[in-house]
Amino acid sequence: MKRIVLLRLGHRPERDKRITTHVGLTARMLGAEGMLLASDDSGIVQSLEDVVRRWGGNFYIKNNVSFKQEIRNWKEGGGKVCHLSMYGVNLPDLADELKKCDKLMIVVGAEKVPPEIYQLADWNVAVGSQPHSEVAAVAITMDRIAEGEPLEKEFPGAELTIVPAERGKHVIENAGE
Amino acid sequence: MKRIVLLRLGHRPERDKRITTHVGLTARMLGAEGMLLASDDSGIVQSLEDVVRRWGGNFYIKNNVSFKQEIRNWKEGGGKVCHLSMYGVNLPDLADELKKCDKLMIVVGAEKVPPEIYQLADWNVAVGSQPHSEVAAVAITMDRIAEGEPLEKEFPGAELTIVPAERGKHVIENAGE
């Protein structure tokens, strides 16, 4: 099975708290195995771990990583690195190649990223060459390169499960073990 | 041509500033004609209008609308209304129907939405029945129902244009008129 991990660069505690949380939720929902946070923010870790506890699956969050070390390890393990921004090669021209990759690190920055990321990445990918939401970039990229239907993925071990409904909210509390 | 407008509910100035800006950027990038903001926040309007001025196109932002009035007007004009949340019918089961619709309002809330939106919407759509980023929900929905390749859309009248590049940033400043 394809492995995808997300690396979040340039996160500033407080200012980027909600955007980074949305990046993490999006990556989890679309099948990433975890998120590496290249900043120190235990609040992000807690809020995403709380989601995993209640909604299931095995998504992990690693706080305060060295991005260079993580990229080096990933590449040494045979992985590829794809950096999403508004400046790279447009996603439609690379999606087929990314889709073939079975071990992919997706890197997204906040407003500023360390310039060396453009060299460290195997691919610099633009998700449209327009002002950019990193949440949307992760969403569109992962949706387009997913195996099967990512929106039907199940998350084992959930305390809560939503039953799709035409009107209103239908949530099941699963019995504990 | 298909018309799509985005309606943003439940925006709280300050707390939701960046998420709502990302919702607007995403809607613009993927071809919405504008965003209706059902809260009063002129800062959002300014920052998105600034993007439009520099990066082109005709995306508009309407501040402090009445959501009920806007939905009523839209429906009277023959439009349909699709509310994205984590509770509705899963997107893969509705995307074909949404794609056929040539005048679509996409509604996204923040943490809380007025309950009547579930009744006012023609469709309540879940983008995966998992904890939810409204930015990702807009991105995936608009990408899946787009006509043609939304990431190759051009934005006329831009001061700045990005040239896709394998490494680094390549931005052209267009000559004024």
Swiss-Prot record, chains A, B:
<keyword id="KW-0819">tRNA processing</keyword>
<dbReference type="GO" id="GO:0002128">
    <property type="term" value="P:tRNA nucleoside ribose methylation"/>
</dbReference>
<dbReference type="GO" id="GO:0106059">
    <property type="term" value="F:tRNA (cytidine(56)-2'-O)-methyltransferase activity"/>
</dbReference>
<dbReference type="InterPro" id="IPR002845">
    <property type="entry name" value="tRNA_mtfrase_aTrm56"/>
</dbReference>
<comment type="subunit">
    <text>Homodimer.</text>
</comment>
<keyword id="KW-0808">Transferase</keyword>
<keyword id="KW-0949">S-adenosyl-L-methionine</keyword>
<keyword id="KW-0963">Cytoplasm</keyword>
<dbReference type="Pfam" id="PF01994">
    <property type="entry name" value="Trm56"/>
</dbReference>
<dbReference type="InterPro" id="IPR029028">
    <property type="entry name" value="Alpha/beta_knot_MTases"/>
</dbReference>
<protein>
    <recommendedName>
        <fullName>tRNA (cytidine(56)-2'-O)-methyltransferase</fullName>
        <ecNumber>2.1.1.206</ecNumber>
    </recommendedName>
</protein>
<dbReference type="GO" id="GO:0005737">
    <property type="term" value="C:cytoplasm"/>
</dbReference>
<feature type="binding site">
    <location>
        <position position="84"/>
    </location>
    <ligand>
        <name>S-adenosyl-L-methionine</name>
    </ligand>
</feature>
<keyword id="KW-0489">Methyltransferase</keyword>
<feature type="binding site">
    <location>
        <begin position="109"/>
        <end position="113"/>
    </location>
    <ligand>
        <name>S-adenosyl-L-methionine</name>
    </ligand>
</feature>
<comment type="function">
    <text>Specifically catalyzes the AdoMet-dependent 2'-O-ribose methylation of cytidine at position 56 in tRNAs.</text>
</comment>
<dbReference type="InterPro" id="IPR029026">
    <property type="entry name" value="tRNA_m1G_MTases_N"/>
</dbReference>
<comment type="similarity">
    <text>Belongs to the aTrm56 family.</text>
</comment>
